[in-house]
Amino acid sequence: GLGDVYKRQAARGVKDFIMITLGTGVGSGIVINGQMVYGHDGFAGELGHVIVRRGNGRLCGCGRTGCLEAYTSATGVARTAREFLELRNDESTLRQLPIQEITSKDVYDAAVSGDKLSQEIFEYTGTILGEAFADFIAFSSPKMIVLFGGLAKSGELIMRPIREAMEKNLLAIYKGK
């Protein structure tokens, strides 16, 4: 599980951190004082299901609308691509693909190749993540947030907008740390 991963990976020796896996869904774990937080029923730390868009948010697999996972998982990125392609007229190499078959990997490949619309999709996704991370920091003050999963391997395409949105939305006491 996530707890086993951190012992061998980036957070070794760190007692307060959050792990986020950006895959088909959004997995997460919160570690405080070296202990994984489970809550009274074992379900604490479902950060993929915090609401990031109220009102007219996307339907999530959990049945609610507006969850982080609906926007920032691999399937969320593919959905953003479909929405951008349907609602906008921008040129994009993604238009050469059958719209319902577009994957987050297709968006990544296009973005790396210079496709502006695909780069905007990463900007949009990273901004949502960064805003959420600012909130996560406010409630647990982690020393770090460790990202895993396919989307995390997108490097600066995803990390730059995450950092910018997070820093912009942090409480003043956390800025620059």
Indicate where each model-derived feature is located.
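ATP-binding/phosphotransfer module of carbohydrate and carboxylate kinases, centering on a glycine-rich
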Residues: K7-K15, M36, R54-C60, R64-K177
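Short glycine-aspartate micro-motif
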Residues: F17-T21, G27-G29, L59-G61
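Fold-independent oxyanion-binding glycine-rich loops
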Residues: L22, H40, G55
